Amino acid sequence: MVGSALGLTFASSSTLDYAAHLDRRLHDLHCSFVPGAPPTDAAEACRTAMYSPYAALFRDKYWGGIPISLFALGAFAFFAGFALYLLIAGERAPRRAVGFFALVGVTPLLVSLVMAGISATQLGSFCKTCVGIYISSFLLALGALLGAAPKGPSERPLGSWLVPAAFLPALGAVSLVPAAVYASSVPDHRPYLGLCGSLKKEPAAGDALLRMTGQRPVKPALFFEDPLCPTCRAFHQRLAAEGVLERLDVQLALFPLDSECNWMLSSAMHPGACTVSKAVICGKDRGRQVLEWAYDEQEALSRAGKLGAPTLRALIEKRWGADTLQCVDSNDTKQILNKHLHFATENGIAVSTPQVFLGKQRICDEDTDMGLRYTLRVLAPEVVR
């Protein structure tokens, strides 16, 4: 009963966070081990999980998709009700009902193990709300198995096979009901997808943008990215995971949010981003490889950037060699990065990353995270598998 109630609480928090973003705005998240804790803006791991391809189903049909927390919500509601029934019935509960509860009571734990594996291997972080669901699943499974363990002679009636035969489809139905209700109420986002403007000045050779052409490009795109921007990293990784990058012919304008080189900032949001951006430029044909290395090592590079230039430069030299550092220090590289920043200014780019254009059309910020796959399916179906 305790595990079901906790699971219901954590699944509700996760679902409410997801549904709140249907208004296309950014909201704080309930990211805490404490059930019912207030939302907070310090929830990077939970936001990473929410924006990941694993957080929802049918993302290409519904903006944001159908969050998997809805299925957990329905399942935990069923288990809470069944646990209450067993608690009230006591020794009068049929053995087959107890056995059924023990059998299906481990299923949330099995799903939690799969999701925990994805968090560890694909996301690299654990959402506290998700961990709360994992713990709840463990408590539910433990209680269900202990309740079915023999404790000597029992006076419980055997019960009919109709008990599991009836309750198994009931579990499936109750698990699906929240998702069905959610799907029926998701607003149509198509009218909003084209309201964020278009490119003012197309890239020219003199802008010296970098090229990241996929293996099967079918659509031109323009990205403004900062290699030390966590949102850029998540966006890039989502595109790569869904195979979209391989279908795009991307021109990359580096837009470091670092006042060392970016005159649009009075202070650095991402210290060291200018140096790392120059390293990406110095990668030339390997620019995408250097950018993805920066994303993979973003935490270490960000810490080094805050410690100072020598620490950051040492990390770059260790991976890419002394020649790259010489290139980073060259006046030519500085001028190229300056051209990228001027190109951003000419297009009225906000001091925020990533900024994304498909062809000439700007993709709204909110459509680059939760609504990304839906947006691509509507605006550029040829790039979605």
Residue ranges and their predicted role:
Residues 6, 227, 233-317, 345:
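Structural alpha/beta surface segment adjacent to cysteine/selenocysteine redox centers
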Residues 7, 120, 211-239:
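Local sequence-structure signature of Cys/Sec-based thiol-disulfide redox active-site neighborhoods
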Residues 16-28, 108-139, 188:
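Interfacial helix-loop-helix junctions of multi-pass membrane proteins
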Residues 66-88, 107, 111:
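Hydrophobic alpha-helical transmembrane segments
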Residues 137-168:
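Cytosolic-side transmembrane helix boundary signature
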Residues 157-185:
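Internal/C-terminal transmembrane anchor helices
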Residues 224-225, 236-243, 310-385:
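C-terminal cap of thioredoxin/glutaredoxin-like
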